[in-house]
From Swiss-Prot:
Organism taxonomic ancestry: Bacteria, Bacillati, Bacillota, Clostridia, Eubacteriales
Enzyme class: ligase
Name assigned to this protein: UDP-N-acetylmuramoylalanine--D-glutamate ligase
GO MF entries: ATP binding; UDP-N-acetylmuramoylalanine-D-glutamate ligase activity
Gene: murD
Pathway(s) served: Cell wall biogenesis; peptidoglycan biosynthesis
Gene Ontology cellular-component annotations: cytoplasm
Keywords associated with the record: ATP-binding, Cell cycle, Cell division, Cell shape, Cell wall biogenesis/degradation, Cytoplasm, Ligase, Nucleotide-binding, Peptidoglycan synthesis
Taxonomic superkingdom: Bacteria
PANTHER family noted in UniProt: UDP-N-ACETYLMURAMOYLALANINE--D-GLUTAMATE LIGASE (PTHR43692:SF1)
Residues given in the record as ATP binding sites: 124-130
Main location: cytoplasm
Compartments (UniProt record): Cytoplasm
GO biological process: cell division; cell wall organization; peptidoglycan biosynthetic process; regulation of cell shape
Name of a matching Pfam family: Mur_ligase_C
Source species of the chain: Ruminiclostridium cellulolyticum (strain ATCC 35319 / DSM 5812 / JCM 6584 / H10)
């Protein structure tokens, strides 16, 4: 029996609970709380007309609702407030509620506090989803019963009654989720850190500090996996509470997971173990070699080396990450809608040997685009731009040319809709070309999320004649 869970159920039954947001991730949470008699009020800034699907999902359940633009003004009297990950914990209304005695928490915070199984968790600016998926697949292949959650999979608190002590839980955690987390995973992985989400975080330092919460309260028996090649994550070893392990594609470090002579190798004090040759990894790109190295460092104490190699040679990749959509008349279309930052787009473009037709742009989240000038010059033959960041991406490219006294030799096309951008990209393509959607920007100007953006792109591509 999970005594912590039973005590939580007993305690929360006597509380008034507010759940902020009636989105896909919170519906299972609301259903779960109601299932053992919790008094739940669901809050959302949208109106009932815009929440038809959610209301249908919750139909017949004893849930109260507080809706509309002023929904945050009605938090008085609640004992516990579940914030949605994208909601800053220092909003004045939340601060006031806490001052009045409310406990501010989240689905993930409660899950980590109550989970009986060992938890592996991954964060970072790039590579989170692929690395998390690799850890999940590797541990599953070894025979462990595994649960996948956080930013991917399904909300896990609603399934916690079924999680056993012998299971493994693998989580992808964003900086938003980590801002208020106190309970750390026993194996924490930070893939890399670069400026990101500065439209939500007040500064780069706040973003870094949020990422550090994944390990800052670990104990001496826990493990922290760090990227030696990233200056920010490399320095976190000084704050590690338990064991720390580096992975490095670029440096020959004495211990950790390294990439030497085209092979992923695990170096320990008295042993060297070869995992796999880089060219046998099925998904392309040096960034995916790094993702495998991070996953190897996280799992090597729990699985056989050949298990890692078997996954590496067979795993096709994650949807919306350099995903081949179709080939039409010799032109390949790739969907990499997950690429919401310049660093992700740079990594994606580096996987292609020849110059590509790039579709980029989206919502501006306040990060610099200077780094894109060089990669556009080297890897792009035609640039199609859309959204608020279109002019910033073009400016980064042209500034790069000007600083080096180079001439512009690529065609730049600005578009207003995704239908237009797909049609014009197709019109510019010749046999043998690759067209890739890699926005280097978030999706929220036109879409619900990056998955929605990627699915719209795929539908438009598949409708081309």
């Amino acid at each position: 029996m999970n005594n912590k869970l039973e005590q939580f159920k007993k305690d929360v039954k006597n509380k008034r609970v507010a759940v902020m947001g009636i989105g896909v991730s919170n519906i299972p949470l609301i259903k779960y709380l109601v299932s053992f008699g919790v008094d739940v009020t669901a809050f959302d800034k949208s109106t009932e007309e815009k929440l038809t699907d959610a209301f249908n999902e919750l139909k017949g359940l004893p849930v109260k609702y507080s809706l509309g633009p002023d929904y945050l003004s009605r938090l008085n009297g609640f004992d516990m407030i579940f914030r949605t990950p994208g909601m800053r914990p220092d909003l004045p209304e939340l601060v006031e509620a806490v001052a009045n005695g409310a406990e501010l928490t989240s689905e993930m915070e409660v899950f980590l506090k109550l989970c009986p199984a060992q938890v592996f968790a991954v964060t970072g600016s790039d590579g989170k989803t692929t690395t998390t998926t690799l850890i999940y697949k590797t541990l599953s292949e070894e025979g462990f019963k595994c649960w996948l959650g956080g930013n991917i999979g399904t909300p896990l608190l609603s399934k916690i009654d079924d999680v056993a002590e012998t299971d493994k839980v693998i989580l992808e955690l964003s900086s938003f989720q980590l801002m208020t987390i106190k309970d750390c995973p026993s194996v924490a992985v930070i893939t890399n850190i670069s400026p990101n989400h500065l439209d939500v975080h007040k500064s780069l330092q706040e973003y870094i500090d949020a990422k550090k919460n994944i390990f800052i309260n670990q104990n001496e028996n826990d493990k922290l996996v760090l990227n030696f090649d990233n200056e920010i994550t490399k320095s976190f070893n000084y704050e590690a509470r338990g064991e720390y392990v580096y992975f490095s594609r670029l440096n020959n470090i004495n211990e950790g997971v390294v990439y030497q002579n085209g092979r992923i190798i695990v170096k320990k004090e008295n042993s060297i173990t070869e995992i796999i040759e880089g060219d046998k990894i099925k998904i392309p790109g040096v960034h995916n070699i790094e993702n495998y190295m991070a996953a190897t460092a996280a799992t090597i104490d729990y699985v056989k080396p050949e298990t890692i190699a078997r996954i590496a040679s067979s795993f096709n990749g994650v949807e919306h990450r350099i995903e081949l959509v179709r080939e039409l008349n010799g032109v390949k279309f790739y969907n990499s809608s997950i690429d919401s930052s310049p660093s992700r787009t740079i990594a994606a473009l580096k996987t292609f040997k020849d110059k590509v037709i790039l579709i980029a742009g989206g919502k501006d989240k306040g990060i610099p685009y200077d780094s894109m000038g060089e990669i556009i010059t080297e890897k792009v033959k035609c640039l199609l731009l859309i959204g608020a960041t279109a002019s910033r991406i073009e400016e980064a490219y042209k500034n790069y040319l000007q600083q080096r006294d180079l001439e512009n030799d690529i065609k730049i096309i600005h578009c207003d809709t995704y239908q237009e951008v797909v049609q014009k990209a197709h019109a510019e393509a010749e046999q043998g070309d690759c067209i890739i959607l890699s926005p280097a920007s978030t999706s929220f100007d036109m879409f619900k999320n990056f998955e929605h953006r990627g699915n719209v792109f795929k539908e438009l591509v598949n409708n081309l004649k």
